Amino acid sequence: MSITVHIQYAVPKASVPLQADFLRWVKAALVNQSKAGEITIRVASESEAAQLNWRYRHKEGATNILSFPFEVPSCVSLDVPLLGDLVICAPVVAREALEQTKKEQAHWAHLVVHGVLHLLGFDHQQEVEAQQMESLEVTILESLGYPDPYESV
């Protein structure tokens, strides 16, 4: 499996994880997948995340992560599949980590893994789907050395 991760920064790089961390988290989420491809991660400001959240989900305010799976039109053939885009709001991630008394790096890892699973088609709208997705997230994060993000502190 070959994966390319493009990182776009709309906030200062000093306030976000290293590109190598993003790549490690994406690869961990894809470890049991045979899919090769490309993913773009945009590290957004709060205003940009709020605009995108309103445009695509009709919800006010910034959210921590938005996932945009790429659907290839049937008339298009790609050498390297585009898996999709993730938009992660750096200020929301920092605030949530503080509020939830989590290490910020662990929260970033969780959100990247969560987003990649959405790009692969996982969802959490129904209880059974949520349990399956959360279980997979916990397993992936533990393989990276991070604690269960759903465990109460």
Curated annotation (Swiss-Prot):
Main subcellular location of this protein, as a coarse class: cytoplasm
Keyword set includes Flavoprotein: no
EC top class named in words: hydrolase
Keywords, comma-separated and alphabetical: Cytoplasm, Endonuclease, Hydrolase, Metal-binding, Nuclease, Ribosome biogenesis, rRNA processing, Zinc
GO molecular function annotation: metalloendopeptidase activity; RNA endonuclease activity; zinc ion binding
Compartment annotation: Cytoplasm
Binding site for Zn(2+): 114, 118, 124
Alphabetical list of Gene3D superfamilies matching this protein: Metalloproteases ('zincins'), catalytic domain (3.40.390.30)
Gene Ontology cellular-component terms listed: cytoplasm
GO biological process: rRNA processing
Essential cofactor(s): Zn(2+)
Domain of life of the organism encoding this protein: Bacteria
InterPro entries: MetalPrtase_cat_dom_sf_prd (IPR023091), YbeY (IPR002036), YbeY_CS (IPR020549)
Cofactor binding: number and manner: Binds 1 zinc ion.
UniProt-listed Enzyme Commission number(s): 3.1.-.-
Family label: Belongs to the endoribonuclease YbeY family.
Function description: Single strand-specific metallo-endoribonuclease involved in late-stage 70S ribosome quality control and in maturation of the 3' terminus of the 16S rRNA.
PANTHER family: ENDORIBONUCLEASE YBEY, CHLOROPLASTIC (PTHR46986:SF1)
Protein name: Endoribonuclease YbeY
Gene name tied to this protein: ybeY
